A protein has these predicted regions:
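A short, flexible loop at the N-terminus of ABC-type nucleotide-binding domains that lies
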Residues: 1-32, 36-37, 63
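GG-anchored amphipathic helix commonly corresponding to the ABC/SMC/Rad50 NBD signature/C-loop
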Residues: 139-162
Length: 216
């Protein structure tokens, strides 16, 4: 899968702004972007300078305006993106109150997934002691469990809210990146918004830099 964001038709206003998660206001200085399946991307910008905007744009959460987005050469809509995307952070999503086991087992059946629950537990490093806990109440395992649910739901794009470098560094020892690599190897796209490339560049396939360039 190849995703192209075309900003060439944007006239006048060069920025896109949006209220995200009701607490974050983010502005992206629009530019062309291309992403390929099978990769984990770090979306790098200062807080409020576009990394979360682009993440949620790919998640089908933001109106395109004059932007055009193409998947494998086909012009797609916000709803098209929403139907194939999955938020790694469940706390703002409808599935936050679902338990790990029941939600995954139901989705396996609904989507006729060839994997068993045991396969998913192994692939995403899910702790059996937390199988009956609601996703929003998980701590270090929350993103892995959400990723597992998105995977068995057949999603192709996995996006996330802004997190700082220390968050990703702490998650490195929790098997989160092993789970995300499993997703990427299955042909999905993962985007991780962060304020600096200090650590993230060592664990993702590519960084996309979004901070505006200021003339001096």
């Amino acid at each position: 899968m190849n995703i192209k964001i075309d900003a060439s038709r944007v006239a006048g206003l060069i920025t896109g702004s949006a209220n995200l998660d009701k607490v974050v206001y983010d502005t992206w200085y629009l530019k062309d972007v291309e992403l390929m399946s099978g990769k984990i991307y770090g979306l790098v910008s200062e807080y409020g300078q576009g990394c979360m905007y682009l993440s949620y744009l790919l998640g089908g959460k933001i109106d395109f305006g004059d932007l055009q987005i193409f998947i494998d050469g086909i012009n797609v809509s916000k709803e098209d993106l929403k139907s194939i995307s999955w938020n790694l952070e469940p706390s703002k999503e409808k599935y936050k109150n679902k338990t790990v086991r029941k939600s995954i087992e139901k989705s396996i059946i609904k989507n006729k997934c060839s994997d068993t629950f045991e396969d998913i537990v192994e692939a995403f490093y899910l702790d059996e002691r937390r199988h009956d806990i609601k996703l929003q109440y998980l701590s270090g395992e929350r993103w892995r469990a959400s990723a597992a649910l998105g995977y068995v739901s057949g999603k192709s794009i996995f996006y996330a809210p802004y997190k700082n470098t220390s968050f990703y560094h702490s998650m490195y020892g929790s098997n989160m990146f092993k789970a995300l690599r499993y997703l990427a190897d299955k042909g999905t796209i993962i985007v991780l918004p962060v304020g600096s490339d200090t650590f993230i560049k060592s664990v993702v396939d590519e960084c996309i830099y979004l901070d505006p360039v200021y003339e001096q």
